Amino acid sequence: FVQVGEAPSGTRADAVVTVMNSKRAIEIVECGERCYVVDSLAWLWDAPSPGGLVADAYLYQELPALPVPERNIQGIPRPIAIGAVGGPDPQRPVTDEAGSDIVVNLAGLRAPSPDNKEVVRAYLGVIAQNLLDPCRAEGRPLQIWGNATLLADMLPERFADLIEAGDQEQFSEACSKARVVITSPGLTTIVECLQRGNAIGLLPPQNLSQLRISERFLAAGIVGIRWNGDSLSWLARQDMPEPLGVEIINKYIMATREHPSVATPAAWRGLVDAQALSRHVADKLIGPGGGERAVARLLHDDFTQSS
């Protein structure tokens, strides 16, 4: 197995598998004799899978908490529902190494541009005032993960020593040692934390897909922060384009410059004090997993039948 960009020029692989990047599948389908698309966002109401996708199979994650609308897979060649992909072993590893009491994951922040720089700064201001400062005042061991360059530039300087840089494996290792992971509502991180057995708390969403993810999991009992209580819950139920949803959410984020509390101190405290869900409850949300094995089996069967 090699990354597409690392293959010798002019080579065609027996198969190309693109994971969580169905848009790029249209570009790389010519890189291999066969193309398999693994998607985690087929459930999004506003984002049916891209038209013009020619693939040997479209494997979409369908989790109990996020069922996929039938219209989102209509017209896609060979759609196959699979369980959650990837993540660590279901049980957290036993380790004597000390980790941080709290891991704060700020992945998903968009790189600042003239249009959104102040939105990013306002969002991080909310997190700093309501979560990071109180944790630090209590002396809680804390790590902040995400785009380290962006965070170093946009977070207040007093948090510079808490920012961690590393790859996904290093982030997962940090989470495995933490008592609680407080994270942006990204699906991959939520799934991995629930598989691992982490206690988890959800930060307020930054975009429409995060809002929809957050609403589903908050309704199921995971603790988290909503923008100004329930006032955005209606938006999660609307069938609208992502850019319009982002524009609405950005207005709520910018309003925090006047009213930065967003939620009660008790609600923020709930993130820090979150308890891990039982395996039974986690399975009711994300299923038993095994999506990566389903992908491997499909490739094995396809190539066995054709040989």
Protein language model features and the residues they cover:
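Active-site and donor-binding regions of nucleotide-sugar-utilizing enzymes
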Residues: 1-69
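Donor nucleotide-activated moiety binding/catalytic core segment of transferases
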Residues: 5-8, 148-191
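Short, acidic/turn-prone active-site loops that include or flank metal/cofactor-
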Residues: 6, 39-45, 64-65, 163-169, ...
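A nucleotide-sugar donor-handling region in carbohydrate enzymes
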Residues: 54-114
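Conserved catalytic-core segment of nucleotide-activated headgroup transferases in glycan assembly
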Residues: 89-148
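Conserved donor-binding/catalytic loop of nucleotide-activated donor transferases
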Residues: 176-178, 194-198, 220
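Nucleotide-sugar donor-binding patch of glycosyltransferase catalytic domains
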Residues: 199-262
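C-terminal amphipathic helix plus adjacent low-complexity
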Residues: 235-307
